[in-house]
A protein has these predicted regions:
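Active-site acidic carboxylates
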Residues: 1-89, 136, 153-160, 177, ...
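Short beta-strands and strand-loop turn motifs
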Residues: 59, 137-142, 168-170
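Generic recognition of short, well-ordered alpha-helical segments
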Residues: 69-70, 98-99, 125, 150-154
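Short acidic-hydrophobic, aromatic-tinged amphipathic segments that line or gate anion-handling sites
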Residues: 86-87, 165-171
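Internal catalytic-core helix/loop-beta-alpha segment
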Residues: 88-132
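Short gly/pro/ser/thr-enriched loop/turn and capping motifs at secondary-structure boundaries
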Residues: 93, 120-121, 144-149, 173-175
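A short glycine-rich beta-strand->turn/loop micro-motif centered on a GG-aromatic cluster
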Residues: 113-116, 136-149
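Substrate-gating cap/lid alpha-helix
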Residues: 144-164
């Protein structure tokens, strides 16, 4: 199995699947506080990746239906990537949409950090497909949420069985840095403070 230490800011892309205003309400395993924390962590990884110069691919599904637009936090943090997002017309496994798969391939990175809403429907299928194609994938569980707690458990089992590790954002970012002398560390520490990540850690976050 690949290890987080194999991923670096210079060889990794961030892929966010269906973090939409309607879809987040379908993450039934999460309560309101946990959904707010998810928004904080997805903003954290998005802003960090942008500051570190990592390629970012966004995709959404059926924006004019109940799923809605991507989270406002992502629209604000990633205006350029939001403008280039892959808007799927109903394809459930994002990897089955050639525009999405080609956008990921076009990053030129073989290491992918992936998160999705919901975990069981929107993250697992494209993560498995990307891994099957030969990408190294790590799934970020605190920017993902399943329809049910059982769905979350099954999702992690499927990912692990396919050799895809699961991580949370903060330790994954420190692993990407490798050394606090990394130039991207400035963004890391600034975001830890400005987004209240340190406060969440000190208070014992619930994700």
């Amino acid at each position: 199995m690949i290890q987080p230490s194999d991923f670096h800011t210079t060889d990794t892309a961030l892929v966010l699947v269906d973090h939409q205003v309607g879809t987040i309400t379908w993450a039934g395993e999460l309560n309101t506080v946990q959904r707010d924390q998810l928004k904080t962590y997805v903003t954290f990884i998005a802003k960090f990746a942008k500051a570190a110069g990592m390629p970012i691919v966004l995709t959404s599904s059926l924006e004019t239906e109940a799923q809605g637009l991507l989270l406002p936090e992502l629209q604000t943090a990633l205006p350029d990537e939001y403008a280039k997002r892959v808007k799927r017309d109903g394809v459930i496994n994002a990897w089955d949409d050639p525009n999405f798969a080609d956008a990921v391939r076009a990053t030129g990175k073989k290491n992918l950090l992936m998160g999705g809403l919901t975990t069981d429907v929107c993250l697992v299928p494209p993560a498995l497909s990307a891994a099957k194609e030969g990408f190294n994938v790590i799934a970020l569980t605190d920017i993902s949420g399943a329809c049910t707690k059982r769905g979350a458990e099954n999702s992690v089992s499927l990912l692990h069985a396919a050799g895809i590790p699961t991580m949370t954002v903060t330790p994954m970012v420190t692993s990407l840095l490798g050394n606090y002398k990394n130039p991207a560390s400035g963004a890391f520490f600034e975001l830890m403070g400005s987004l209240g990540i340190l406060t969440l850690m000190q208070g014992g976050d619930v994700l």
